[in-house]
């Protein structure tokens, strides 16, 4: 006759340990049967649960995401939610009413542009911070505003190390405002105008402007939050990547 295993008395902790290992095994089996898109969604919902049901920002999703899943996202741009976060949220019905209004208009196109703009260096980020302006988003930035935002960005931590040929913070501090502005205009400002899908434009009296059609949407809170989140995430990801590569 078959042996009745239920008659064996295991120590309580043994049963618990066995149960937990079995649950882990089932979880691993589940993961393997899921498509990578489903795994990313599952990870999103896990992070959302950690945040007590709050929709994660890009920064929050990055901070709490499983390292292996994040690395996969970085290597597979097609499935990477950080390259098209509003699209990702739209597909899983997680956009707020205000975000849906942005999503259906020109604001989404602009956010998508700054989310995906090429970044060999970090130089575009202080320019975008100049436009963001602590939440009072500008349609154009003057030379002085560019220099102010640029220096504020590179004064922080070791960000100054992004300047080639500058070997110390003291040496960085010797760079003049005129030199900073020249670098900003010859590199990020030039490239934003060239590859900005017509969003970044010349404006009389300003170092750089964005299209007037954005005048209404830049006042919307949801737009401001998205813009800030994109700039913060892209800055952080740039430095993470640089750290890993070095």
Q: Which residues make up each language-model segment?
A:
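Long, largely alpha-helical accessory region at the distal end of helicase-like NTP-driven motors
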Residues: 2-88
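Mixed-charge, low-complexity interaction segments
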Residues: 50-246
